[in-house]
């Protein structure tokens, strides 16, 4: 039987300043975005579109705003609208936690739409470019969840079941944060990186991301404990699963549309 080590959520103390692990994981995700982004712009079919390092820096700025604002508002609207309606000032206390990937994803989409308009690029060309790097941030975020001992899984009798003292029940549970790290982080990154190494029709890489994330998240939710203030919804699916299903459908439509529209041409070749 494994027991969660209960890491100190504060990684570094600098006088009165406390730097939390979760914040460091966000930073790690942004650094990996820049690192792999620079590798990506060296790929011939990407370089042919005129992508340069400065684009990465600007996209990161827009993306950070999208992640933070969208992630917070998504949590407020998708998970606790009633609470924040009566406690509106609590919305601004982001340091106390409460971020939603699906909200952050929508925030990034809006941010990239603005970036595309400013740079006069097609919005989907931008999303195709960044899609392979997004799992880096997802992986880092799930490690942050594990370090904090939050978003634990459902009870299990499997050998790797872990007791999370924060749950307060001394029951072995799935380390679902690590499942999500492996699925929507590592596996999705490998799939997207390999898929995007060759020229693809515009929208195809974005579509594969939506399918991959939606599928990995949907499956992982079967092992993840539902939020206690929501529980399971219709058909005994969690909120995360219901939000992931449209991503899978939209992603599939995008891939089919991209290849039918492409007629052998690719976004990189246009």
Curated annotation (Swiss-Prot):
<keyword id="KW-0997">Cell inner membrane</keyword>
<dbReference type="InterPro" id="IPR001640">
    <property type="entry name" value="Lgt"/>
</dbReference>
<comment type="pathway">
    <text>Protein modification; lipoprotein biosynthesis (diacylglyceryl transfer).</text>
</comment>
<keyword id="KW-1133">Transmembrane helix</keyword>
<protein>
    <recommendedName>
        <fullName>Phosphatidylglycerol--prolipoprotein diacylglyceryl transferase</fullName>
        <ecNumber>2.5.1.145</ecNumber>
    </recommendedName>
</protein>
<dbReference type="GO" id="GO:0005886">
    <property type="term" value="C:plasma membrane"/>
</dbReference>
<feature type="transmembrane region" description="Helical">
    <location>
        <begin position="237"/>
        <end position="257"/>
    </location>
</feature>
<dbReference type="Pfam" id="PF01790">
    <property type="entry name" value="LGT"/>
</dbReference>
<comment type="function">
    <text>Catalyzes the transfer of the diacylglyceryl group from phosphatidylglycerol to the sulfhydryl group of the N-terminal cysteine of a prolipoprotein, the first step in the formation of mature lipoproteins.</text>
</comment>
<feature type="transmembrane region" description="Helical">
    <location>
        <begin position="59"/>
        <end position="79"/>
    </location>
</feature>
<feature type="transmembrane region" description="Helical">
    <location>
        <begin position="17"/>
        <end position="37"/>
    </location>
</feature>
<keyword id="KW-0808">Transferase</keyword>
<keyword id="KW-0472">Membrane</keyword>
<dbReference type="GO" id="GO:0042158">
    <property type="term" value="P:lipoprotein biosynthetic process"/>
</dbReference>
<keyword id="KW-0812">Transmembrane</keyword>
<feature type="transmembrane region" description="Helical">
    <location>
        <begin position="202"/>
        <end position="222"/>
    </location>
</feature>
<comment type="similarity">
    <text>Belongs to the Lgt family.</text>
</comment>
<feature type="transmembrane region" description="Helical">
    <location>
        <begin position="129"/>
        <end position="149"/>
    </location>
</feature>
<dbReference type="GO" id="GO:0008961">
    <property type="term" value="F:phosphatidylglycerol-prolipoprotein diacylglyceryl transferase activity"/>
</dbReference>
<feature type="binding site">
    <location>
        <position position="142"/>
    </location>
    <ligand>
        <name>a 1,2-diacyl-sn-glycero-3-phospho-(1'-sn-glycerol)</name>
    </ligand>
</feature>
<keyword id="KW-1003">Cell membrane</keyword>
<feature type="transmembrane region" description="Helical">
    <location>
        <begin position="95"/>
        <end position="115"/>
    </location>
</feature>
<feature type="transmembrane region" description="Helical">
    <location>
        <begin position="175"/>
        <end position="195"/>
    </location>
</feature>
């Amino acid at each position: 039987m494994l027991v969660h080590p209960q890491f100190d959520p504060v990684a570094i103390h600098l006088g009165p300043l406390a730097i939390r692990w979760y914040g460091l994981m966000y930073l790690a995700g942004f650094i990996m975005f820049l690192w792999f982004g620079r590798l990506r712009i060296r790929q011939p079919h990407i370089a042919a579109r005129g992508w340069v390092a400065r684009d990465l820096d600007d996209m990161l700025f827009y993306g950070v705003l999208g992640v933070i604002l969208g992630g917070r508002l998504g949590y407020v609207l998708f998970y606790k609208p009633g609470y924040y309606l009566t406690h509106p000032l609590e919305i601004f206390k982001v340091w106390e936690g409460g971020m939603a990937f699906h909200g952050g994803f929508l925030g990034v989409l809006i941010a990239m739409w603005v970036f595309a308009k400013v740079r006069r690029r097609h919005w989907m060309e931008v999303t195709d470019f960044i899609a392979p790097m997004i799992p880096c941030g997802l992986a880092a975020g799930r490690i942050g969840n594990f370090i904090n001992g939050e978003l634990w899984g459902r009870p299990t009798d499997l050998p790797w079941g872990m007791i999370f003292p924060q749950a307060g029940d001394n029951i072995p549970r799935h380390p679902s944060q690590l499942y999500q790290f492996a699925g929507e982080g590592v596996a999705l990154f490998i799939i997207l990186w390999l898929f995007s190494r060759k020229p693809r029709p515009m929208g195809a890489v974005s579509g594969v991301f939506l399918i991959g994330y939606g599928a990995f998240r949907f499956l992982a939710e079967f092992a993840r404990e539902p939020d206690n203030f929501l529980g399971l919804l219709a058909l005994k699916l969690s909120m995360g699963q219901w939000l992931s299903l449209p991503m899978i459908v939209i992603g599939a439509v995008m891939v089919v549309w991209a290849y039918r529209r492409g007629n052998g041409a690719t976004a990189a070749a246009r």
